[in-house]
Each structure stands twice: as C-alpha cells, then as structure tokens.
Amino acid sequence: MSVFRRSVQCVGVLPSILAQRSSLLARPANLQFLKTNSSKFVPQVTANVSRRMYHKNVLDHYNNPRNVGTLPKGDPDVGIGLVGAPACGDVMRLAIRVNKDGVIEDVKFKTFGCGSAIASSSYVTTMVKGMTLEEASKIKNTQIAKELCLPPVKLHCSMLAEDAIKSAVKHYRSKQLTPVGTTAGAIESATA
C-alpha cells in the first residue's frame, strides 16, 4: 500500500475516490498538508454530512429516545412485539402494558438498528401511550414516516414500528384468550 493511501485512510477520507487523483495528491508537499491540516477540516466535513443525513425529528428521538426498556414477559397485561428486517438487520422489540379498560398505559422498546429505526421505535411509543388497542392497531407507517420526515430509503424503519405495535397488540390479545394455568397448545389439542 502506498504512503498516500495509508495517509488518506488515517485522515478518514475515502481512498478509492481520491486514488484517481493520486498523482497530484501523492506529492510530498500535498501529503504534508494532509498530515498537518487534516484535523482542521475532516471533523467539520463529517459533522456537516451527518447533520444533513437525518431530519431534526429523527435526531431528537435518536439522541433522546423515549421509553427505552422492557416490560415483564410473564405479566398477563403485557403484550410483546418482536419484528425484524432481514434486508438491513434492524430488530425491534416493543412491549405494551394494557389496563383493564383496554388502554395502553405503558410502552417500552429496545431496537438494534440504524438511527431511523431507533427514532421510529421511540416515536411510536410516545404515539401509542394512552391509546386504546383498536386505535393502536390502526397506526400506519406513513404517520410515523411523515412525523420523522423519513426519506424513501428509510421507510422500512417506519414499517417495522407499525409491525411491532400490531404484533404487540396481537400478542396481548392472544394472552387474554388463554385461560390462566394453560398454554395455547393445550387449548388447541383439547378442542381438536
């Protein structure tokens, strides 16, 4: 590997893009300039790029996520939705606690994914708290995407959030249909 390419990697600039101009940049004077001045301009370039990539609403929910955590899986008033997107590796776990009136009184999430996935999870938890199960089941990913100003390439994150809340509601309802002390498998075999 040439001195130029090693220097560029240390600076954090993409070597494949600059390699086309290596004859100009590989001059000793230019290499010295990069070594002495890289810390002055590279962080600013990085900061400007990251600010442009995400909308302020996404950054707010990403930097200050609301309702992070878990709820006990064994609690009969808790429903859990676990969804994932194989294409990008995002995984969301969303848990809801429902009161006796069918209103979601607490919501928690844990998400492994990009900033848009975390922001979508955080936003949907603030959205559904206080809703009935029926209202929460009607949430559409377009509402989430519109509020967070997600670009088309990140719409799958809002779809995951929609799927997670619907899965949590479905899980909660299935737990309510299962009599205490039995399992769903035992009920199915008893009725067959």
Swiss-Prot record:
Coiled-coil regions, chain positions: none
UniProt subcellular location: Mitochondrion; Mitochondrion matrix
Matches recorded under CDD domains: IscU_like
GO molecular function, one term: ferrous iron binding
Annotated cofactor note: Binds 1 [2Fe-2S] cluster per subunit.
InterPro entries according to UniProt: ISCU (IPR011339), NIF_FeS_clus_asmbl_NifU_N (IPR002871)
Claim: Iron is one of the keywords in the record: yes
Listed pathway(s): Cofactor biosynthesis; iron-sulfur cluster biosynthesis
Cofactor(s) named in the record: [2Fe-2S] cluster
Transit peptide extent on chain: 1-53
A GO cellular-component term linked to this record: mitochondrion
Gene Ontology annotations of biological process type: [2Fe-2S] cluster assembly; intracellular iron ion homeostasis; iron-sulfur cluster assembly
Pfam annotation, one family: NifU_N
The entry's keywords: 2Fe-2S, Iron, Iron-sulfur, Metal-binding, Mitochondrion, Transit peptide
Record's function text: Scaffold protein for the de novo synthesis of iron-sulfur (Fe-S) clusters within mitochondria, which is required for maturation of both mitochondrial and cytoplasmic [2Fe-2S] and [4Fe-4S] proteins. First, a [2Fe-2S] cluster is transiently assembled on the scaffold protein isu1. In a second step, the cluster is released from isu1, transferred to a glutaredoxin, followed by the formation of mitochondrial [2Fe-2S] proteins, the synthesis of [4Fe-4S] clusters and their target-specific insertion into the recipient apoproteins.
The family this protein is said to belong to: Belongs to the NifU family.
Full protein name: Iron sulfur cluster assembly protein 1, mitochondrial
